[in-house]
A protein has these predicted regions:
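HINT superfamily self-processing domains
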Residues: 179-206
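SF2 helicase motor core recognition
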Residues: 82, 162-169
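N-terminal accessory segments
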Residues: 1-69
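Signature of the SF2 helicase/ATPase Hel1-core->accessory helical subdomain module
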Residues: 171-179
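Contiguous, well-ordered alpha-helical segments that form the cores/surfaces of helical PPI scaffolds
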Residues: 57-61, 83-95
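Post-Walker A helix-loop "phosphate-sensing" segment adjacent to the P-loop in P-loop NTPases
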Residues: 92-101, 124
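Conserved nucleotide-state-sensing and coupling region of NTP-binding domains
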Residues: 105-161
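Walker A/P-loop
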Residues: 68-88
Length: 206
């Protein structure tokens, strides 16, 4: 269909522009429901995509679509591993499967609960409900480390060594289960050096 824009009134142009924006937004929502990376881009406006992000997103989509049962991701710090795996993935999972259960484990309960707070806040956002209509937090979801959706789904955060007896999960996320404590000796060309004394740009032996 061809439109002669020059023959349209200003009001008609405004209306057409509105309809096009609504169509584009509807496409964006549908894309975000279907794929993890489009969900990231919609929910995280400042996200800058790197070459590795598509690979991680494909792996997560495989897990959610039942093509993989488990994956292990090893990356250097500051490559958005935790943001992807421990914040956006659980939120996306509960958007698609709001009646399922998630367990988030980290080396300390404080870290795990911190992730839980961010996931909870993400699920409670209005733009999340735009992508997944009808999915929201349950009315009593106050605790950051243990909360539920309004569809019966549950989120539980725990530190390594915490009690998990009787707990089950449809999605288990383990982020940094081992952390090097202060004072941990690291081998370097000059001998063993405490981890907190390592210099930026120095060499270590792995």
């Amino acid at each position: 269909m061809h439109f002669d824009l020059d023959r349209l009134t200003p009001a008609e142009r405004v209306e057409i522009d509105r309809l096009f924006r609504e169509l584009e937004d509807a496409r964006s929502k549908e894309s975000a429901r279907r794929g993890f990376l489009p969900f990231i881009k919609r929910m995280w406006p400042d996200f800058i995509e790197g070459y590795h992000h598509q690979r991680i997103a494909d792996l997560f989509d495989d897990v959610l679509n039942g093509k993989r049962k488990r994956i292990i991701i090893n990356m250097p710090p500051r490559h958005t591993k935790s943001e992807f795996a421990s914040i956006y993935l659980p939120a996306y999972f509960l958007g698609k499967f709001p009646n399922k259960k998630i367990i988030q484990a980290s080396h300390t309960s404080e870290l795990a609960v911190g992730f839980g707070r961010k996931v909870r806040d993400l699920v409670g956002r209005s733009d999340f409900r735009d992508v997944f209509p009808g999915v929201d937090l349950s009315a009593d979801s106050k605790a950051a480390g243990r909360w539920a959706t309004n569809k019966g789904g549950e989120y539980f955060a725990i530190g390594v060594g915490g009690a998990l007896a009787g707990k089950g999960a449809d999605l288990l996320v383990i982020d940094d289960p081992h952390a090097l404590a202060l004072g941990t000796p690291i081998p370097t060309p000059d001998g063993f050096v405490a981890i907190e004394d390592l210099k930026v740009g120095g060499f270590v032996f792995g």
